[in-house]
Amino acid sequence: MMNFPLNPAAANEDVRRLYETAFPKEEQIPWKDLMRLMKTMSLDFTVYYEDCDTFTDESTAAGSSRLLGLTIVYPRSQFNWFWYFAVPEELRGQGIGQRILTQLIEKYKGKSNILDMESPEQICENSEQRKRRHAFYLRNGFRDTGVGKSFKGIDYTIMMNGEGTFTQRDYDLIIDELRSFWDSMPKEG
């Protein structure tokens, strides 16, 4: 599996489509805004492709190999926020997500990693999917922090791997930082 940092100018339609189909609309930052936000804050947006013979960058890989997934990580001094993690629906359940997550954890070893996911406890149409996702993260060394949030009617649970704890205050600080970046983002224009 090959992975490449994503340059906003080189983001191809397959990457955009995966982002826009893997997450409910209410959980997405609009694509144009996400590309602008990447110019304001330090986000590690990585795309993953099947191994192939040779290529030099993400745009070349996109033409010669199948897209396996994407991740967006917000590296912070205290911990890393695993913000978005997606594998195409037709490839789920084949161990690809496990390989990507293993690479991510290895890349960011030495610091704890935090993620939020739709709560497996909330009664909803996709409750089985949420339970499978929660079990996936538990199998991969994440644990529930006891911190939760609700946004646009969706309950989220915060999970962590690594040492230490994660508190509501930690979560509130991240949200304040994100708002600050959002407010300072260059406007379209």
Where are these regions (language model features)?
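Active-site rim helix/loop that mediates acceptor-substrate recognition in acyltransferases
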Residues: 20-55
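Conserved acetyl-CoA-binding loop-helix of GNAT-fold acetyltransferases
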Residues: 87, 93-107
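Conserved GNAT acetyl-CoA-binding A-motif
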Residues: 108-129
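Short amphipathic alpha-helix that is part of the acyltransferase structural core
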Residues: 1-33, 60, 169-189
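Intrinsically disordered, low-complexity terminal tails and inter-domain linkers enriched
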Residues: 51-65
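Conserved acetyl-CoA-binding loop of GNAT-fold acetyltransferases
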Residues: 135-145
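C-terminal "cap" of GNAT-fold acetyltransferases
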Residues: 46, 130, 150-189
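Conserved beta-strand in the GNAT
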Residues: 47, 65-74, 79-86
